[in-house]
Every structure is written in structure tokens, then in C-alpha cells.
Amino acid sequence: MFMNRWLFSTNHKDIGTLYLLFGAWAGMVGTALSLLIRAELGQPGALLGDDQIYNVIVTAHAFVMIFFMVMPIMIGGFGNWLVPLMIGAPDMAFPRMNNMSFWLLPPSFLLLLASSMVEAGAGTGWTVYPPLAGNLAHAGASVDLTIFSLHLAGVSSILGAINFITTIINMKPPAMSQYQTPLFVWSVLITAVLLLLSLPVLAAGITMLLTDRNLNTTFFDPAGGGDPILYQHLFWFFGHPEVYILILPGFGMISHIVTYYSGKKEPFGYMGMVWAMMSIGFLGFIVWAHHMFTVGMDVDTRAYFTSATMIIAIPTGVKVFSWLATLHGGNIKWSPAMLWALGFIFLFTVGGLTGIVLANSSLDIVLHDTYYVVAHFHYVLSMGAVFAIMGGFVHWFPLFSGYMLDDTWAKIHFTIMFVGVNMTFFPQHFLGLSGMPRRYSDYPDAYTTWNTVSSMGSFISLTAVMLMVFMIWEAFASKREVAAVELTTTNIEWLHGCPPPYHTFEEPTYVVLK
């Protein structure tokens, strides 16, 4: 019975729960890796050994957080749980494929861990650039295992994307048009389209790298007429949409949370929000070379990528100001989920501002591969994506489990996390502006102060992670059941009680649209 339910599940709620659990465990692995990085950088001098092991940890940290924490939780966890409930579908369009999407992830994770255990590990950075990732600089199986890991994670995401696109377009009630679906459903749909279009390009790039390493091809080897810059173009054509894949479902969740705790029945500017997400998705595909300003592109190419990148700030601004307009005049409830959402809006905006700075190719020549870039993308990921996940988790936890988290603990947790991540990443702007380069395990003494502050901040964040584990334990131990849910009229995922029955919407829903 247990095996049938959890190994062969075709139920979107069970699979969503599996994704959430997997993402939580992977998140703890990723956090452990990040603390190793900060421990190494907490003081000048070596701690762990050589730069190879340091770079293996950095590479693993990135892959674990992106492919095994953020994507499984946002798309697999919240997506699976909420999309069918929000559109009134009985399940996903392809329930068995849904199960396969999940079960491809543990083997993929295993291959990634194996890559760091054999030989010297893959110390390439998450970009896996040749010639460093070639079979001279990285002899042995490490990089090959990493490539296979990415293949599996990629197949998992592509199958999931097909499933979500089909479900969202095809499984709404007949009376419901696409423009009446909630914003979270829209965000998952757009994310799925981005995955479907970008991942095959990554697959092509890393497969060529695999044959370069093992079958004597020369796609990226100038000696045989290849070009390492080709790899960079292929990688970043995936890599840039990927960062929007990581944040878009978060946008959807934040829209729901802000609307809910402002006491509003709908977000401000629904169509503007949809249009903004579609614009961000489209523009995300035509700005990839801003990651490559230092490889020597023509001045007109650099001018184009600079301006195209800056244009993304417009739809992003539409979203930020629409969230603020949703808050305006509302009956604001200062719940933990609302705190996460407000923290998201503020810190994501800060991360966006440093992104505008980096979009300038002339400035990026100086700031590329410094800690300024690290600070920028950790503000939008560690305080954008993660804050959205935390906000979504404390908001929908009663729906998933039927139990309530302790409000006071949840607010303390938010406060500790807020202090921790800011103390970790704000000083990195100063380090970057002072020229401290990324991906080195040691640094000149001049950089000591801010690195020490940054490392202290990371340990504050660690206490927040541990507190969250305690909070979840406390909720299941105390078993405070959900009495009543407000605003069910506009949030139909809450309509069937907490938690909802194993099968919801077994008969097609009758929808009256006003």
C-alpha cells in the first residue's frame, strides 16, 4: 500500500508533496555547501585545501540549489499542488508522466553527488565552460557525470513543462477562458514554455561537450576548427531564460499572497501582470550575451544587448508597482506570509537595480566575475526565489497539511532569515566594487572585513533554516487544525477544506463567470 501510494503515485497532491520533501532535503544539502564556501572565505588563508575542491563545492552548491531545490519546490511542489486545484481540474493531464518527472530527479541528484566523489570532482563552475571542462583540464569521469546529471534533470523538466502546458490549456472548465485563470497558473504556464524552449539548447551544448571529451569531436576546440565561444552562446541561451524560470513562479505566488493579505478580491492590473510576465518571458530569450560582455563582441552587439537587457526592467517595474497598488488601500494583515512577500518586493527590487548596473556593457567589463555579480544574483535568488518559496510555504502549508504553523515562530523565522541574508550578501557589493574576483578560495587581506561579516551572516541564515525545521515539526506535533479560511470565493484552492480530499473535482465543475 505504502509502496503503491508513494512510488507509483499518479496523484498530483502526492507528487507535489514528494517534490516539496525532495526540495527541502536538497535545500539543506545546498545550504551545507554554501556554509562550506563561507567558512573558507571567513578569514584569509586556506581552510579546505586547494582551489579545485573549493570550486567543486561552489559548482555543486549552484547545481543543487537551482535544479534540486528551487525548481522542484516551485514548479514541481507548488505547481503540482496548486495548478489543478486553481483551474478545477481533477489532476494533471499526464499523471504517470508526472510521476516519472519526479523520479528522474533522485537519480540525477545521485549522479551530481557522484561527480564530486570521483577523481578530483567537477570544479568548473555551474557554467561548465570548455576548455576548463575539457578532458585535459578535467580528466576523469567527474564532468561526464555532471553532464549526465543535467541530462536527467533536463528531461524531467521538459516532461513537466509539457504536462503543465497541456493541463493549463486543456483542462480548464469549458466556461473559463485563459484570461480568467489565477496569476500563479499563468506564471507556471509561461515558465513551462521557457523550459520547453531553452532546455533542448542546453542539452545540445552539453552533449557536444560530452562528445568533445570522449569521442574526439572538436565543437569547442580551436585546434579542430571549433570555438569555445559557441559553447558560451549555447549555454547562456539556456542560462538566461533559466534565471527567469527560477523567479516567474515566485512572481505568481507573490501576487496571490499580496492580494490575499491585503484583503483584496483580485490583484491590481491583472492583464498588465499577465502581459508583464509574457514580456519578461519573451525578452529573457534575446538578452543572453549580456553574460559574455568580456569575450570581445562588436560595439554594436554590446549596445544591443545592453539596451535589450534594460528593457526587461519595464515589465518587471509593472509587476512591482502593481503589487504596491494591490497593497494600497487594503486591509493589511501582517501575517508571516505577507512579511515574506513584502521582503520579496523590496529585496528583489534591490537585486533588479544592481542588475541594471551590470547591464551596462562598459561597467560590466569591470564588474564581470567579481563579487558584485554574486551579490546581484543572490539578491534576486536568495532573497527573491527563496523568499517567494518561504512565503508560499507558510501561506499554503495549512492547505497541504491541514495544520497551522505557529504565527510567532514564523515571524521570528522571517526576521532571522531577513537579517542573515542581508548581512551575507550586502557586503559582497562592496567587495565586488573593490575588485574581489569570484571563484577563488583566498583573497588579499584588504578584503577581510567584509568577507568576515558576510560569513557571519551566513551562519545567521543557518539558524533560520534550523528554526524552520523546528517549526514544521512543531506544527505536526501540536496538530492545530484549520478552523476557517477567509476569501475562499476568490481563491478556489481553499474551497475543499484543509487538506482537500485525495481526489478533488472528480466531476467537471460548474462555473458561473460574472
From Swiss-Prot:
Membrane side Mitochondrial matrix: residue ranges: 1-11, 87-94, 171-182, 262-269, 328-335, 401-406, 479-514
GO process annotations (BP): electron transport coupled proton transport; mitochondrial electron transport, cytochrome c to oxygen
Cofactor binding: number and manner: Binds 2 heme A groups non-covalently per subunit.
Topology Mitochondrial intermembrane: residue spans: 41-50, 118-140, 213-227, 287-298, 358-370, 434-446
Residues bound to Mg(2+): H368, D369
Compartment(s): Mitochondrion inner membrane
Family matches, as Pfam families: COX1
Top-level class of the enzyme under EC nomenclature: translocase
Associated pathway: Energy metabolism; oxidative phosphorylation
Chain residues that bind Cu cation: H240, H290, H291
Family membership noted in the UniProt record: Belongs to the heme-copper respiratory oxidase family.
Record text on subunit structure and interactions: Component of the cytochrome c oxidase (complex IV, CIV), a multisubunit enzyme composed of 14 subunits. The complex is composed of a catalytic core of 3 subunits MT-CO1, MT-CO2 and MT-CO3, encoded in the mitochondrial DNA, and 11 supernumerary subunits COX4I, COX5A, COX5B, COX6A, COX6B, COX6C, COX7A, COX7B, COX7C, COX8 and NDUFA4, which are encoded in the nuclear genome.
Protein name: Cytochrome c oxidase subunit 1
Organism (species): Phoca vitulina
